[in-house]
Amino acid sequence: MKKCWSVLTDDMGSCYITHLGVAHIHHVFNGSRKKASEERGFLVPLHPTLHTYGPDSVHMKPNQGLDLRLKQECQRYYEEHYGTREEFIKEFGRSYL
């Protein structure tokens, strides 16, 4: 199993939001951009209710609420450390800011 890392947190064993010790690893940008999420560190540990099981989870409400917040945080990081907004859009399909 390869080691997961995140630009958002050093603690991959606890939920980024609740800090509880039960966490699923969420690819902030998924689908065809899943590999880019792994390469850029755009992974985040989330409690299962925030990841897939809750009514407001990132997979139940894509591009809204928490999912949008995480995408925006990652885009800001990208623009500060990796490249321009135009390069972000080329790599991840659109701007979330």
Q: What residue spans do the PLM features occupy?
A:
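Short Cys/His-centered divalent metal-binding micro-motifs
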Residues: L43-R69
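Amphipathic alpha-helical interface surfaces
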Residues: H24, F42-L46, C74
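Short cysteine-rich clusters marking metal-coordination/redox-active sites
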Residues: S14-T18, H47
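Short, charged surface segments at domain edges that flank catalytic/cofactor-binding sites
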Residues: M1-S14, K34-G41
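Short functional micro-motifs and their immediate structural scaffolds
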Residues: L20-H24, T52-P55
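Short recognition patches in nucleic-acid-associated and regulatory proteins
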Residues: V22-K34
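Short flanking/linker segments adjacent to small metal-binding domains or redox-active Cys/His motifs
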Residues: K71-L97
